[in-house]
Amino acid sequence: MNSVLITGAGYRIRKRGDVLTIETGKDSDTAEPPRTLSPLGLDLLAIAGDHSISTAAVRLVTSHGGAIALMDGLGNPFGHFLPLGRSALIEQYEAQASAPEERRLEIARSICTGALENKRTLLSNLERIRGFDLSREIRLVEDAQDKALECQSLDSLRGVEGSGAHAYFQGFSLAFDEEWGFLGRSQNPATDPVNSLLSYGYGMLYIQARQALVLSGYSPYYGAYHETYKKQEALVYDLVEEFRQPVVDRTVVTFLAKHMATPDDFTYPDEGGCMIGTMAKKKYAAAVLTRIHGKVKYEEQTFQDIFKRQAERIGKALTEGDEYVPYRYRT
């Protein structure tokens, strides 16, 4: 899938002859020389942020079989221009939606075992650095990994993954002092500061996963492990699973261990739940973004790059039957 991403703000995308021109608008603070882009072989033009595009430019891209994705400044897609008739993007969506159940189950097993492996790795890291005895929790997560490989249905797989996640959060809770009130995972609403940070961080991961999938030419909706219902973006949730521990959970541990927030930075509204204060939220969001955009140990890439790689892998696994190899967290 040949895709081009335009980010920032204020660019004007126009048709000039048989090519597209991309230039800064009249009100832009910085003038840049115009750039040209050929529509030949272009499968997807992704436009993120506030820009303008002419109908002639839309017609030029779509007449060559390409699609245009419109995204907000955070990378959330909100619309597409698609060519009439067949196109590479439409065919890829159809192949994704019609993936056989056996293939989906195989991919789902890989997603679960990869996610459980990354949970085990973070627990082992906490045990080594903090001196906790997490042997029981690690063993339970490993048992869940072994059982996941034998599951013959998505329902049984979800049950096994749930038991492994429960054991993981029992061990993970030891990383926090009693003042944080964290006893395990809770959401909708989060009941304590740690859960509030986890949920907010996972939301940031969804944005990364969604953008990576759209740029790779895959629909966020047709997944393998999670169900598609009520407009839930199943493939986004699938892709996020293996990144929760290495990106968000690890950041939460470091963020609170460095005293970058206190319990007073969180509020408890009358309607229930726990909310992050404005200043703490800014600091925490910056910490998560630093993690996402920083180089990953043992990899010559950032997590943002790895998201793109894994999006292409999971998409090919669904549409072409390739083996899905999840990201393995190493410390």
UniProtKB/Swiss-Prot annotation:
GO molecular function: DNA binding; endonuclease activity; metal ion binding
Its EC number(s): 3.1.-.-
A Pfam family annotated for this UniProt entry: Cas_Cas1
Keyword Protein biosynthesis included in the entry's annotation: no
Keyword Isomerase attributed: no
Keywords, sorted A to Z: Antiviral defense, DNA-binding, Endonuclease, Hydrolase, Magnesium, Manganese, Metal-binding, Nuclease
Gene Ontology terms describing biological process: defense response to virus; maintenance of CRISPR repeat elements
Complex and partners: Homodimer, forms a heterotetramer with a Cas2 homodimer.
Similarity annotation: Belongs to the CRISPR-associated endonuclease Cas1 family.
Protein name (record): CRISPR-associated endonuclease Cas1 1
Species per Swiss-Prot/TrEMBL record: Methanospirillum hungatei JF-1 (strain ATCC 27890 / DSM 864 / NBRC 100397 / JF-1)
